[in-house]
A protein has these predicted regions:
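Histidine-centered metal-chelating micro-motifs
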Residues: 61-63
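A short, surface-exposed loop/turn module that caps and links secondary-structure elements
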Residues: 32-57
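Hydrophobic pocket-lining residues within nucleotide cofactor-binding pockets
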Residues: 18, 45, 49, 79
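Residues that form or immediately flank small-molecule/cofactor binding pockets and catalytic motifs
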Residues: 10, 50, 81
């Protein structure tokens, strides 16, 4: 089954902030790869980010996404570097955006 991608403006903005163009390209390639069998890629997240999945890109970079099986949509919510304990950690950013309601307002469930 082929899925349609919906990428949030927030995610696009986060990708633009990645200074290494090779990593930007790798992120985009991994996102494109989510069109086919996204449920077999990445891992299921827990706690505040339950119902989301994360896929490794290059090094410590991650893409956070959600699958809507009913409408065959992969919602790509955020992308960035994993820096545990840092303010710029992609999971920390995603949690803040989710709490602020910004992720849910940008993409359908």
């Amino acid at each position: 089954m082929t899925y349609r991608l919906e990428i949030t403006e927030t995610c696009l903005s986060l990708i633009e902030k990645v200074t290494d163009k090779r990593i930007q390209s790798a992120i985009i390639d991994r996102i494109e790869g989510l069109k086919a069998d996204p449920e077999k890629k990445g891992k299921v997240l827990v706690k505040e980010l339950a119902n989301f999945r994360s896929i490794h890109v290059a090094g410590r970079y991650r893409v956070i996404y959600r699958i809507d099986e009913d409408s065959s949509i992969v919602g790509v919510l955020a992308a960035g570097i994993r820096k545990e304990g840092d303010q710029k950690d992609i999971y920390r950013i995603a949690k803040k955006l989710l709490k602020a309601g910004l992720l849910d307002s940008e993409i359908s469930r």
